[in-house]
Amino acid sequence: MENWSQSIQQMIDIIDRCIRQQEDEALTLRALSAALRYSESYVSRKFRALSGMSLRDYLRFRHLAFALRDVRDTSDSLLEIAVRYGFSSHEAFTRAFRAAYGVTPSAYRLHPTAVVLHTILKPFDCYLLGIGGTGMAA
């Protein structure tokens, strides 16, 4: 990779593709690091520095963002959606959804409103972090 901003975008693209295709086994720090050709510790440190959250937390929020869309836009059962996005039970999904969005999935389905998705990488100063490049905008 020429610079880290391209690498982080590539990682996000891989994450989204894997979630859409339900290939969660590819969503490990080891697999993502190998795809980017960086060490696991480097990817973990830089991801946290750029996003303000661990890769694990980002993956959880990203799964919830996809699940939120399905709750709103499909008639699939909440259990089907929960299982699709890696939750062990309807209850675990409901707890995570409520913690992230302040409302249960069933209440959100009845009255969908705008919610804050915690999956946008915050702006950063690439020179301050010592990684070069021009930022997240490509």
Q: Which stretches of residues belong to each language-model region?
A:
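…primarily DNA-binding HTH/wHTH and HhH modules…
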Residues: 1-6, 10, 95-138
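Terminal helix-turn-helix DNA-binding modules in bacterial transcription factors
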Residues: 13-20, 26, 30, 49-85, ...
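Basic/polar phosphate-binding segments, predominantly the helix-turn-helix DNA-binding elements
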Residues: 26-59, 82-104
